[in-house]
UniProtKB/Swiss-Prot annotation:
GO cellular component terms given for this protein: cytoplasm
The name this protein goes by in its record: Elongation factor G
Biological role: Catalyzes the GTP-dependent ribosomal translocation step during translation elongation. During this step, the ribosome changes from the pre-translocational (PRE) to the post-translocational (POST) state as the newly formed A-site-bound peptidyl-tRNA and P-site-bound deacylated tRNA move to the P and E sites, respectively. Catalyzes the coordinated movement of the two tRNA molecules, the mRNA and conformational changes in the ribosome.
Species this protein is from: Pseudarthrobacter chlorophenolicus (strain ATCC 700700 / DSM 12829 / CIP 107037 / JCM 12360 / KCTC 9906 / NCIMB 13794 / A6) (Arthrobacter chlorophenolicus)
Stretches that traverse the bilayer: none
Keyword flag Protein biosynthesis: yes
Gene that encodes the chain: fusA
PANTHER family the UniProt entry points to: RIBOSOME-RELEASING FACTOR 2, MITOCHONDRIAL (PTHR43261:SF1), TRANSLATION ELONGATION FACTOR G-RELATED (PTHR43261)
Signal peptide from the UniProt entry: none
């Protein structure tokens, strides 16, 4: 079969491999690529040689950061795989991949069962209604326990597992699986090291006598569960008739696609055992693009008008950009999922999210970081495109005559920042290039400039996130720079109005001097309404000439960058110019700007200035036995409890906690809950800092 884009969409699977960090996700992907003939040599994560981990830091840290898209073939079916990261700081990558997948393989560590990050990723997959099959990996590991892992899938995820296989042997003696559908054994001969076929061949044998009874018990449970998928099967089952393998497969497929149950397989990807039956299951049970409901979007000219696109080549072209990656030769690669229609390489399309025309230069199907050029892109597939200049993550590309905006992905605001100081002018230029490219790739990475210190401030989703971004700047863009400690972004405001404050700026040093006299009033604005600054001019009778009034406004705005308490930006201010005086010769725009700046500074000191801090919405999911400790810990961080409720097998605690109290929280939470609790944090609002805490921050900022 020509391994090109298949036109029969029933033979296509767009899947993700999702798991907790270290459950063996990348190794599993490598084995899939090996058995499907894409790879000729198996790369190990712990050797730093795997196909999908292609960024330098991924190879070093042995974790997957960027989801690489890989295309492979199995039994005449095309499987497009997205490898997703399992670390909490990269949830944005995971959300992006899940958004464009039709199904997923959830990989679990056979010894650890469901781990905190497996839970986070599982909930994200629930959010996007992604059907899943499960692969219990590392069955060769000391202490591996298949039945324990299945129990944790029920207790921690509240999911309904359908056991499809039982392990034969355990730890070093793990040699294969019992296939409950066909009631037979699949055994991989030889030790992984001595087996020249690398697990590509397995033998079909009788079920071992010591497992026969257990296999019959699990097979009966499987048949009973699947009989519920339709009335015909239920009737047949109740009449005592045998259900055929094809009937069982059809029932399992239907229930998997509806997310009513999750088929469970087991193996050891590292020892090359159990991967092929899992690939068969991807084809047998996970949805193809035709099984997925039509995509819903809206008309860019009328947000209320709902539009849909079916996964057919006859519909108008529509696609979603879900990832931007920098490529060493092609520059920017934009990964797209085509939902409907067809587009040729070189065609002009519209980015309906931004209202801009774009030209698709070349199109590729990707094998990690190798590219296979294709002439056109068709519904149901994932491609990498080059030549798109204005398209960023979450944007829709579509046919200009039939425009649609597919629902975009929403990304959380960054919560932590560090200052970066380039060592030389050359480094400053490299830093600008790096920032431009990295922020195009990653919507949760933001950049600003500290006017006073001239430092570049970068903000992201967590400490590891910023570490990796800084590391990429150094490696990929050769930026040499000093990096500060993580900081909280405080603000300042006032609580009291000052009705009149006079200020005269006067300088006489021979020749023409400088003169400006103004009287201003200031009052607080409600920042919750988004009102950060307002200026009003109430001067009458030309006492301050009209051309100088914008200078007073500019001077006050200048003063807002640098508050009177600790030098943080000032928000929530209304300033009014009430009166003033000028001199025909000595007055100038600069004199009035200085007067505006100094008048505001003095007035602000009288207006009861206070410090504001970012308050975060923190949600912790913890097993009930750790609830007391978790709540006590939140209180010690100046947190305020908002609510508490039950979810599947866990307690969900919601609280408002100052960001300054959240540094190092992930480590503390792990140690208090044996790594079983997970948390998420999003920005809520700015709130006043209690006086004792504020005094400490102010003293520190003044170097006292």
């Amino acid at each position: 079969m020509a391994q090109d884009v298949l036109t029969d969409l029933s033979k296509v699977r767009n899947i993700g491999i999702m798991a907790h960090i270290d459950a063996g996700k990348t190794t599993t992907t490598e084995r899939i690529l090996f058995y499907t003939g894409v790879n000729h040599k198996i790369g190990e994560t712990h050797d730093g040689a795997s196909t999908t981990d292609w960024m330098e830091q991924e190879k070093e840290r042995g974790i997957t950061i960027t989801s690489a898209a890989v295309t492979c073939f199995w039994e005449n079916n095309q499987i497009n795989i997205i490898d997703t990261p399992g670390h909490v700081d990269f949830t944005v990558e995971v959300e992006r991949s899940l958004r464009v997948l039709d199904g997923a393989v959830a990989v679990f560590d056979g010894k650890e069962g469901v781990e905190p990050q497996s839970e986070t990723v599982w909930r994200q997959a629930d959010k996007y209604n992604v059907p899943r099959i499960c692969f219990v990996n590392k069955m060769d590991k000391l202490g591996a326990d298949f039945y324990f892992t299945v129990d944790t899938i029920v207790s921690r995820l509240g999911a309904k597992p359908l056991v499809m296989q039982l392990p034969i042997g355990a730890e070093n003696d793990f040699i294969g699986v019992v296939d409950l559908l066909y009631m037979r054994s699949l055994v991989w001969p030889g030790d992984a090291k001595g087996d020249v076929t690398m697990g590509a061949k397995y033998e079909i044998r009788e079920i071992p006598a010591d497992l026969q009874e257990k296999a019959e018990e699990y097979r009966a449970a499987l048949v009973e569960t699947v009989a519920e998928s339709s009335e015909e099967l239920m009737e047949k089952y109740l009449e005592g008739e045998e259900l055929t393998v094809d009937e069982l497969k059809a029932g399992i497929r239907k229930m998997t696609i509806n997310s009513e149950l999750y088929p469970i397989f087991c193996g050891s990807a590292f020892k090359n055992r159990g991967v092929q039956p899992m690939l068969d299951a991807v084809v047998d049970y996970l949805p193809n693009p035709l099984d997925v409901p039509p995509m819903v979007g809206h008309d860019p000219r009328d947000e209320e008008k709902e539009l849909t696109r079916k996964p057919s080549a006859d519909e108008p072209f529509s696609a979603l950009a879900f990832k931007i990656a920098a490529h060493p030769f092609f520059g920017q690669l934009t990964f797209i999922r085509v939902y409907s229609g067809h587009v040729e390489a070189g065609a002009q399309v519209v980015n309906s999210t931004k209202g801009k025309k774009e030209r698709i230069g070349k199109l590729f199907q990707m094998h990690a970081n190798k590219e296979m050029p294709v002439e056109g892109a068709t519904a149901g597939h994932i491609y990498a495109a080059i030549g798109l200049k204005d398209t960023t993550t979450g944007d829709t590309l579509c046919d200009s005559a039939n425009q649609i905006v597919l629902e975009s992905m929403s990304f959380p605001e960054p919560v932590i920042s560090v200052a970066i100081e380039p060592n030389t002018k050359g480094d400053q230029e490299k830093l600008s290039t790096a920032i431009q490219k990295l922020s195009a790739e990653d919507p949760t990475f933001q950049v600003s400039l500290n006017e006073d210190t001239g430092q570049t401030i970068i903000a992201g989703m967590g400490e590891l996130h910023l570490d990796i971004l800084v590391d990429r700047m150094r490696r990929e863009f050769k930026v040499e720079a000093n990096v500060g400690k993580p900081q909280v972004a405080y603000r300042e405001t006032i609580k009291r109005a000052v009705e009149r404050h006079d200020y005269t700026h006067k300088k006489q040093t021979g020749g023409s001097g400088q003169f400006a006299k103004i009287q201003i009033a200031i009052e607080p604005l409600d920042t919750a309404e988004g009102e950060l600054y307002e200026f009003e001019n109430k001067v009458t009778g030309g006492r301050v000439p009209r051309e100088y009034i914008p200078s007073v406004d500019a001077g006050i705005q200048d003063a807002l960058n640098d508050g009177v308490l600790a030098g943080y930006p000032v928000v929530g201010i209304k300033a009014t110019l009430v009166d003033g005086a000028y001199h025909d010769v000595d007055s100038s725009e600069m004199a009035f700007k200085i007067a505006g700046r100094m008048a505001f500074k003095e007035a602000a000191r009288k207006a009861n200035p206070v410090l504001l801090e970012p308050l975060m919405d923190v949600e912790v999911r913890t097993p009930e036995e750790y609830m007391g400790e978790v709540i006590g810990d939140i209180n010690s961080r100046r947190g305020q409890m908002q609510s508490m409720e039950d979810a599947q097998g866990v307690k969900v605690i919601r609280a408002h906690v100052p960001l300054s109290g959240m540094f190092g929280y992930i480590g503390d939470l792990r140690s208090k809950t044996q790594g079983r609790a997970v948390y998420s944090m999003t920005f809520n609002s700015y709130a006043e800092v209690p006086k004792a805490v504020a005094d400490e921050i102010i003293q520190k900022s003044r170097g006292e």
